[in-house]
Amino acid sequence: MSCYDLCRPCGPTPLANSCNEPCVRQCQDSRVVIQPSPVVVTLPGPILSSFPQNTAVGSSTSAAVGSILSEEGVPISCGGFGISGLGSRFSGRRCLPC
């Protein structure tokens, strides 16, 4: 029986020619010989990036709050990290209440 034979109908031939039983055929094995050739694969190095975020949320008095939340013109974030991201410059600071 050929590997490409279709499933035979189960019982009387239906109008749609469908079958409720699985159709499985075992074909002969195929053999493929692959000769390895020298291949150089270059994987790109990792790209490291960070996006520090300093956010001040305020109202119509945000200009006054902005002057409180900065030191020497550099914004201070509540997490203790300055805009430089080093973390040690403003680590002892606390956020002021609004």
Curated annotation (Swiss-Prot):
Organism: Gallus gallus
Gene Ontology cellular component annotations, sorted alphabetically: intermediate filament
GO MF terms, alphabetically ordered: structural constituent of cytoskeleton
Family the UniProt entry places it in: Belongs to the avian keratin family.
InterPro entries: Keratin
Designated name of the protein: Feather keratin 2
Complex formation: The avian keratins (F-ker, S-ker, C-ker and B-ker) are a complex mixture of very similar polypeptides.
Phylogenetic classification of the source organism: Eukaryota, Metazoa, Chordata, Craniata, Vertebrata
Modified positions (N-acetylserine) in chain numbering: S2
Keywords from the UniProt entry: Acetylation, Keratin
PANTHER family, per database record: BETA-KERATIN-RELATED PROTEIN-RELATED
